[in-house]
Amino acid sequence: MSKTVVGFILVDAPHSALNNAGADAGDRTDNIVRVKSIRRGRKVYPYVSGQALRYWWRDTLEKKYDWKMSPIERQKKIAFTSANPIKYDDDDVFGYMRALKAKEGGTVTRISPLKNSPLISVIGQTPTQDFGVMARHEGDPVPYEHEFYSTVLKGLFSLDLDSLGVFYTNEKTGYRNMYPQLEEEAEEKGLVKDEESGKWSMPNDTRIKRAKDVLKALPYIQGGAKQTSHLTDVSPKFVILAAIDGGNHIFMNITKEEDGDAIIDTEALKDVLIEYSDCLLTDVYIGRRKGFMDNLEPNINKLTEEILIGNRKIKSGSIKEAVDQFTDKIEELMKP
């Protein structure tokens, strides 16, 4: 059995420019700042890159949960972290790659247990161009342009609980996490090694804490570009959390555009939960900020009254209630 947390989030971006692409070489002037966007057919969908979301998440974990972050080293045109997931929380959760000298152990990599999609607009729309001037000087004002949008962004993430705090010496890309110096440190700090598989495991309380911190940070995620003139709360306004046996993300197709609005398709959500009920390891937790998609409340209340196959239920509340109730299940999920 593999144990994976799957999460779905919506971020309200009513007047925002959260991730910019810079100037476009084809623009008529060189002082237009474009937002990141993709095209599907004739429609344009603004987005926030997956890397930007990870940066916000990591920054929140450092500031609110006092995570010890791996220092960045730079050599010529490459940059890398310390590649020490025992000492640094983020090297464990966010992964790393570092090319050491052969005598030091060679190249080590770690696939991140935390995976996420970009935040992509549910609604197809063309960003608005806003004109401004720099006029706090003598002489002619300097004009400039930038884009912003009004939409709802959707995102997915998963957290591989089996991989958190577990490191391998295997010669396999993505799984050779350890090098001689790190193995010495692991032995000194009492990590348990399985000689047959070459697997080192951190104490379970450390693994559980890291998993809980990652999830508990959700209601507090902050960040984004253009906040001085397009102030936006980027913490999720809608969230779904569950743990499943498997790695596929079952919540990918539960939102859509309808009459120019972003909606949650509760029938699609119900169908996918029933179809994959044999994979559910926990109840399903839905959190929503009041004032956001209030029209969903009757449908969500109806879902919470229905028992899924296997006696799994859908539970709903505020964002923080849903996150706290779900993280209370992490310790049980991560029992040895």
Model-predicted regions and their roles:
Residues 1-336:
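RNA-binding basic/glycine-rich loop and surface signature characteristic of RAMP-family CRISPR effectors
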